[in-house]
């Protein structure tokens, strides 16, 4: 089979601590979105065949929506999929700042996912700390205790944040809870999964696009623990990046250890 024209290279990376990360660089954000969607669809079918369900955790930000639109067009066993949020902004229902608003438009309105298998973060609650604790209980009810998610999609911010684990926030230090409240960031408080459930998940899928991510992608692949994303330490992590984000990777990083 001839190689895909939109795939620039596919390599394996060894990051600090000997953790293997698979890196795939594609032509542009559209190609990354299609590839990510295909990987999620395959993971869903495999999980349902093996375990009878697939628990997918989706991050917010600006990068997921192309991926989720592509996913809506693929063969996915939606009746056995459970969808949870990695993070959410504290904002009113339907507000454009809410990740759920975009999740609804890009995916949920377009697929037959049972409503009772969609688990929005409860950011409208009056007591957000109690709501975060309840959300963690809900997740453990569908994905076990300790919580093990099947696939977690993560993005990467230009400041090195991932999920809503942002530089300097106390949520970075939370290890005794699976869900935490983060302080105001870009004008909004956030609810977020913490490092323990991210690192316990069966699989991590990083989706990184755009030239503003070049330095942070290099640092992520180098295992730089001074950035929040660098503390996601997972033996089954895959990074999909476009050419713009990968523009400053060294020959060694592209070649692998």
Question: What kind of region is each of these model predictions?
Answer:
Residues 13-56:
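N-terminal glycine-/serine-/threonine-rich phosphate-binding loop
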Residues 49-72:
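Glycine-rich N-terminal segment of FAD-binding domains in flavoprotein oxidoreductases
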Residues 58-63, 154-158, 209:
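Glycine-rich beta-strand-to-loop/alpha-helix junction loops that act as flexible
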Residues 79-153:
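Ligand-binding beta-strand-loop-alpha-helix segment within the catalytic cores
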Residues 198-257:
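C-terminal functional extensions of proteins
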């Amino acid at each position: 089979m001839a190689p895909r024209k939109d795939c620039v290279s596919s390599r394996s990376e060894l990051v600090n601590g000997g953790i293997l990360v698979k890196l795939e660089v594609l032509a542009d954000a559209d190609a990354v979105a299609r590839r990510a969607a295909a990987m999620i669809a395959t993971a869903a079918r495999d999980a349902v065949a093996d375990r009878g369900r697939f628990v997918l955790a989706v991050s917010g930000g600006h990068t997921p929506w192309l991926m989720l639109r592509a996913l809506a067009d693929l063969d996915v066993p939606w009746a056995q999929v459970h969808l949870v949020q990695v993070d959410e902004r504290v904002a009113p229902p339907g507000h454009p700042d809410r990740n759920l608003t975009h999740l609804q438009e890009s995916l949920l309105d377009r697929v037959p996912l049972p409503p009772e298998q969609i688990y929005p973060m409860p950011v409208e609650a009056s007591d957000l700390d109690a709501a975060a604790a309840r959300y963690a209980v809900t997740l453990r009810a569908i994905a076990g205790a300790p919580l093990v998610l099947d696939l977690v999609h993560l993005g990467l911010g230009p400041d090195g944040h991932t999920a809503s684990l942002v530089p300097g926030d106390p949520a970075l230090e939370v290890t005794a809870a699976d869900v935490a409240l983060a302080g105001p960031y870009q004008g909004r408080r956030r609810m977020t999964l913490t490092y323990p459930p991210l690192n316990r998940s069966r699989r991590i899928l990083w989706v990184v696009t755009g030239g503003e991510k070049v330095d942070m992608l290099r640092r992520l692949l180098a295992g730089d623990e001074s950035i929040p994303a660098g503390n996601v330490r997972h033996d089954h992590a895959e990074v999909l990046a476009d050419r713009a984000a990968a523009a400053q990777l060294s020959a060694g990083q592209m070649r692998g250890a």
